[in-house]
A protein has these predicted regions:
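A residue-level marker of the well-folded mature domains of exported/periplasmic proteins
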Residues: 1-279
Length: 279
């Protein structure tokens, strides 16, 4: 979208979920004198001062997924763009409920941080289970603050609830760590759901493995919304301060179509081969 509109991208950064690193990257990018900023704050408090420098310089800011702390929409920043985070959690709950026969005990392994996207996913999962599946009990909610500790968190969960039927994780990477821990104690029958489609998690869905399904944001759709929001910011066009794209449930039955819908490209060959092996 940005290329089509003739907008030059002067910097692309990836802080890899490290808020301190993100602050350094934001300050480096500011030195390039950009006309607008599109950014996702990993920690709303840690990054606040860095974003304030853009606001003080009257550089329009469009946030992705999460707004930094204490800023006012439409005044300090243009808008927040996001996928339907609550819907992601809802679909993950529906998929997990179906996979365990609509009864049993499940747990949540969630990202324990002030991060709107995952907070809403988790709320969507919890409220959907509690409202629509009376025979399913959420017996534990185990939080993590770093991907590196998910395995340890999962080990503790399984030690306390060795016969649990299913686990929801805030996204697919911690879900794979949960699966690794479950395999280590012989729980290949455990059902796991989450959000997002990485190559590993997509393969597991196609292979009818322990990751039985996920909800997936439509990345192409979300990217277009972000691009147009940034363009509107550059020309001073007023837009809604919250822009949301759609999501979809993904299971074995639709994983190939869903992957293309989400990312705009065909699923990797390995995923196709795994899916075809079960036909």
């Amino acid at each position: 979208v940005l290329e089509e509109l003739g907008i030059e991208v002067v910097a692309v950064t990836d802080a890899q979920s490290d808020a301190v690193k993100e602050v350094d990257q934001l300050e480096t990018a500011l030195a390039l004198n950009p006309d607008a900023l599109l950014s996702m704050p990993y920690d709303v408090e840690v990054t606040k001062a860095a974003y304030q420098k853009y606001i003080d310089a009257e550089i329009p800011v469009v946030f992705m997924e999460n707004a930094s702390a204490d800023f006012t929409a439409g005044e300090d920043y243009v808008a927040v763009t996001n996928s339907d985070s609550y819907g992601n959690g809802m679909f993950a709950a529906m998929l997990l409920a179906e996979s365990i026969g609509y009864e049993g005990k499940v747990a949540m392994v969630y990202y324990d941080a002030d991060f709107f996207t995952t907070n809403e996913r988790d709320r969507g999962f919890r409220e959907t289970i509690e409202k629509y599946y009376p025979d399913i009990e959420i017996v534990a909610e185990s939080g993590f603050t770093s991907i590196d500790v998910v395995g340890t968190v999962a080990d503790g969960l399984f030690a306390q609830y060795p016969d649990i039927d299913g686990v929801y994780a805030s996204w697919d990477i911690p879900a794979t760590s949960v699966i690794t821990s479950a395999r280590a104690i012989g729980r290949e029958d455990l059902k796991v759901t989450g959000v997002d489609l990485g190559d590993d998690s997509t393969y597991m869905i196609a292979d009818q493995d322990m990751y039985v399904g996920a909800s997936c944001p439509k990345a192409v759709e979300t990217g277009k919304i972000e691009g147009y929001a940034l363009a509107c910011a550059l020309i001073g066009k007023e837009i809604p301060t919250y822009l949301c794209s759609s999501v979809q449930p993904v299971s074995y039955d639709n994983v190939l179509e869903a992957y293309k819908s989400c990312f705009g490209i065909d699923a990797p060959d390995a995923v196709k081969e795994a899916w075809e092996a079960h036909q």
